Amino acid sequence: MDKVCAVFGGSRGIGRAVAQLMARKGYRLAVIARNLEGAKAAAGDLGGDHLAFSCDVAKEHDVQNTFEELEKHLGRVNFLVNAAGINRDGLLVRTKTEDMVSQLHTNLLGSMLTCKAAMRTMIQQQGGSIVNVGSIVGLKGNSGQSVYSASKGGLVGFSRALAKEVARKKIRVNVVAPGFVHTDMTKDLKEEHLKKNIPLGRFGETIEVAHAVVFLLESPYITGHVLVVDGGLQLIL
């Protein structure tokens, strides 16, 4: 199998760390983000012949066009990472409906659409590997994150069901569920207070999550699995 990987949400955070690690391991990368300039900057930092694309994962025609373009320029995609995500914290009673919809569209529907688009090629070539980036709150829930928790919890159910659907085609689907990790999404959190509740006593780094993502991408006998990377936080939630 060729080593062509599409990383959605690859311009920053966990997605960018995944792209960096995979580039070092010899993969050809498509770095995909809503902001094309950010994607180009991330792809440029990788060196080599990696490419950047702009895509709003919540729009099916955007996703379809992106896959057509990246396969035209890089070849068939056989590895897919879904790391695009947004979060708008707030109590449910104070959350605007449009904010609910945008989180569900980006965090859940977006991954569904990219997986659907990738299936055509992966089924044709009888093989592929997908890792969707979830969250520990999708498994445990968290006050003030009911919508985000729903989107990430839904991603787990979707991934497990899809893993069953495509296993006979030699396509694997797994989830990595991070806890608190240093990203733009967590930069405003009260780290000193929160890390006291983490058994390992600190926030994680994006590269630590990236190693888990690549492990699942490359593990030929693992599918339908949720790998939690949270410093032990799940032990006390």
Curated annotation (Swiss-Prot):
The keyword NAD applies. Keywords: Acetylation, Fatty acid biosynthesis, Fatty acid metabolism, Lipid biosynthesis, Lipid metabolism, Mitochondrion, NAD, NADP, Oxidoreductase. Optimum pH is 6-8 (with homotetramer). It catalyses: a (3R)-hydroxyacyl-[ACP] + NADP(+) = a 3-oxoacyl-[ACP] + NADPH + H(+); a quinone + NADPH + H(+) = a quinol + NADP(+). One of its GO terms (cellular component) is oxidoreductase complex. The modification N-acetylmethionine is found at M1. Coiled coil: none annotated. It is found in: Mitochondrion matrix. Pfam families: adh_short_C2. GO terms for biological process: daunorubicin metabolic process; doxorubicin metabolic process; fatty acid biosynthetic process; fatty-acyl-CoA biosynthetic process; protein heterotetramerization; protein homotetramerization. PANTHER family: 3-OXOACYL-[ACYL-CARRIER-PROTEIN] REDUCTASE, SHORT-CHAIN DEHYDROGENASES/REDUCTASES FAMILY MEMBER. This is 3-oxoacyl-[acyl-carrier-protein] reductase.
